[in-house]
Structure formats: structure tokens, C-alpha cells
Amino acid sequence: MHDKLTANDIKKMQEELAAYDRKVEGFLKNREFDQAGICRAEQEKLIHKYEKACEANRKKQEKDELKVTENDIAEVVAAWTKIPVKKLTETESERLMKLESILHKRVIGQDAAVSAVSKAIRRGRVGLQDPEKPIGSFLFLGPTGVGKTELSKALAEAIFGSENALIRVDMSEYMEGHSVSKMIGSPPGYVGFEAGGQLSEKIRKNPYSVVLFDEIEKAHPDVFNVLLQVLDDGHITDSKGRKVSFKNTVLIMTSNAGAQRIIAPKNLGFGVAETEKQNYDRMKEGVMEEVRRLFKPEFINRIDEIMVFHPLTRVDMEKITTLLFHELSARCEKQLSIHLSASRALKEHLVEKYADYKMGARPLKRAVQQVVEDALAEELLSGRIKAGDTVSAGYRKGKVVFDVK
């Protein structure tokens, strides 16, 4: 009964008690002691009722009280410092020990690259590496569409908790000598001085990041001098004289150096059947020769790991197709409340017809969009598939079919 009393009810009781005080005082002044006693007894009952109501109200407030937990504090600190919550709440050793398995969920067919990156990251984080230098620096080479950028994204999510921790720098924007000012900021007196540098400002605001320098061979040689300082000293000084530290970053550079040799290799003499390993070794040798021609020795020597990615095999393509369908199924579940699955026949058809081993996984990704997603969109618009349905995508009689269960 008393639990249902509101704050207004309690306030009314306080007013009634004050009124009783005035009544008792009046009776005593007029020497009406009997009336004063009766009034005091009624007041005592109301006081008892009032105290019980206050106690019930206090207990209710304690029960409903908002409590600040460790996770709440972690969220606030993460918002202030840009350090991911994962890094604050999960022990780093746990993340580092399972780094390979985390990366393998997203990157297919690049065991050597994943292993090398994981080892280098572990070396950097346990304190064996210079604490002022970046956690790790890598140069990713190899054919297009084999997972160089995907590994960078997976690394950002695994180490720093989110793909948003990836800072992507397109090096084709730094082809001119004066474009160095875009990276670290314009000198005083020049246009854009107040804005700061594109790279230096991003790192200053997001110190825990994976920095991806895409197509690094396109950058002007003067830009490499800035990168040399980052790789060597772990910091740069921007145009305003502020020191920007890279010690909590992972630096990844990708290059298409030797791409033409990968797509159209030159074989002298008679054609000889090569094993997969021989083919990779020959490709790696050609790519590294091109790298030594394009980049200065002092730049190459400062990079922790140079990795030439393997071309994808049929088994890799099948795994990638499964991964693409898993992503599509997750999107359908989240956005449309549709449970989507794909038959083995459909996956095999896509790999058989659309897999291009020289162009990597991208043609396969386009095929899933054009063959499956377009057909699914038509089914949704026609009303044959609705929210909440369980749908199985298959391949029969030369076309994609959807069975609603």
C-alpha cells in the first residue's frame, strides 16, 4: 500500500503534519487539553504512516538507482582518448595469443602473411622492440584482390577493436613534391596553415590506429623522407612544431610493384609445367626485383616485414565464396529479418564461372552482387520473399532460384 504512494502524497502528508502542529498549538493556548491530546494522537498515527512511506520511497530509489560500472567508465575513457574499449577491458595477452585465428576468419589463403604479421605485432607489444617506434611496419606486395587491404582492416579490428581504427592514405594524392605539406601541414604564412596536415592531424586525434599507405610506389620521393623519419624515430613534427607520435600505430604499405609480371609472366624458352611453389617463387623473385628498383635501400631496410601474397587457389576461392555468403546472410538477417542460406551447387557455379585467379577475389565479389543479390532484390520487390522468411538460394537449370521455407 505504502509502496504505491507518490512524491505528491508524501508532500501532502508533510502539509497535514504541519496543520496538526498548528491545531495542537491553538488547543494548548485555549487550555483545551483534551482536544490537544486527541489531535496529538491523530498526528502520531500520521507520523507513523509518513515514516513508513518515506522508508518505502527510499528503498525504491535505492533499487532504481543508476550505477556506474567498469564498462561505463571504459566507454567514457574510450570516447575521450580514442583508445578502443576492447583494449581497456580485455587483456592484451589474450588478444595477441589468438591473433592468427582472428585474422584467418577474414583473410583466406595467406597463412604466411598472417603468421608473419602476428609474430611482428607480438614482438612489438611485449616490449622486445624499441618502445618509441611503431608497433610494426609492413610492406604488402603481390597480385591484386588477394587480401592485402582486407588484412589491414582485419588487423585494425583485431588490435584496436574496430575497422574505424584504419586510417587509409591514398598515395596517388602525394605524387607532387609540394604535396608533403598536405601530409604534415603547410608552413606559417601559407594557405592551409591553420588546418594542419592530413596525416599528422589524424594520428594526433587517433593515436591507436592502423595506417594504410595504399599504392606507395606512386608517392613522390620527398614523401618517402617523411616516412623514413616515422619508421626510424617513431614520430614526425608537424608544421606547427608539434611532435606527433606513431608509437601506438601499425604501419602498412601496399604496392602493385611487379603487378604486370604477375598477370603476364615472361617465360623464356619452352613452356614447362611448374608446381604451385615454383610459380610463387618465380613471381616473388620478379616482384622483389621490381621493389629494389623502385624503392631506396634505406627505405626497404627500415620495414619490419616485406610480404609477397600468394595467388588464390580454387580451394581459397571456395572459402571466399562461403565467406561472402556469410556476410550477405548477416546483412539480410540484420536489415531485412530474412534467414538466407546458399546451396553448395550455387557456390560451385560461382567459383566455376566467375573465379579469375589472376584478378583475385574481386570478380567473385562482383558475381555474388550481380548474380545473387540482384535476383534477391527482384524477389523482394515482387513480394515473393518477405521479412521473416527463411530462404535457401540454389542453382538449378542454369539460373539462381530461391526456395522459401
What would you call each of these model-derived segments?
Residues 1-405:
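AAA+ P-loop NTPase nucleotide-binding core of proteostasis motors
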